[in-house]
Amino acid sequence: SQLVKANGWIEGLTIASIILGVLLGGQLVGHHLSAALLSIDIPMIDFGIHTAAEAAIAALILVYALAAWFNTRIPHTGVEMRPLRQHPQRSILASTLALLPDFWACNSRLWHDKLGQISLSTTTLFWGAGGNLKFIVLAWAGVALGYNTTQASALTGVVAIGTAVGAVAASMRMRLDMATRVIPLGIAMGLLLILMVFISNIWLAIPFLILLGGLGGFLVVPMNALLQHRGHNLMGAGRSIAVQNFNEQACILGLGAFYSLSLKLGLSVFGAITVFGMVVAGIMLVIQRWHASNCRNHSEELDHLLHIARQDTHH
């Protein structure tokens, strides 16, 4: 499926950019790179940059400027945009609040779809876990390997390598109607997080983190493609992406709060990672059983939805 292949690129690059951002941030505040940035001197111009943090922020401003330039190169699709303010006499806030009923209706519609609910719950959990994985790796590396922030941030780049490999592999091997077969990989991800507490050697940690990232990349690409397919058919791509992003960001905040609370309640880093891994594996097991129940009780509806996915010639 072309949609799965496209998601291989999109998801792989998105996850890689998030994790590599942590890698870049760790290096920017490190002694060597920050010293090199502070040594840059342009005659007759004083930028007022005197600390490592200020130099790091200045470097990120350049990254944002580059990203903004990339956005200007996105071709116009010709789709007519829906105006935010349908009634000019209303304020922007009032116009935004007026869209909420439509948003919640779309959210409910996707959660009640027999394939949409499985793909949305899987991608939501993945992003919730992946969004907090960088903090887990930093904390684990500090305790298990004795690394400082700069050294530990380099390990997050290792996860990005695995994610990219997994995403590419999924785009080559998976089809849209096969997406639900990757659910067990989510359970494996949670169990691998638990096994992380037993690793204290860097040469064992590197292939382990590559494997962890690879499972994530292979999991999220077909599931995200299936979610976009169902969302496009149910409500259109724009609303579907809005629903997806809302649920994923909420999960990132929720799991992040759960991990932080575990540490605050006195759990060690290893204990918090173990509990976090158990939660991820447990929720994925529930999703697996949920899909199995749908297959038993709504087999005709699922067969029809999968037939639509197989016939999706637009992607």
Where on the chain are the PLM-derived regions?
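Cytoplasmic membrane-interface "Motif A"-like loop-to-helix N-cap segments
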Residues: M172-M189, A237
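C-terminal ends and interior cores of transmembrane alpha-helices
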Residues: I187-N201
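Intrinsic disorder in cytosolic terminal tails and internal cytosolic loops
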Residues: P88, R230, R289-H315
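Substrate-agnostic recognition of the 12-TM MFS/MFS-like secondary transporter fold
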Residues: S1-G30, I118, F126-K134, V159, ...
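Juxtamembrane intracellular "pre-TM" segments in multi-pass secondary transporters
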Residues: I74-S121
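Helix-to-loop junctions at the C-terminal end of transmembrane segments
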Residues: V29, V165-A179, L263
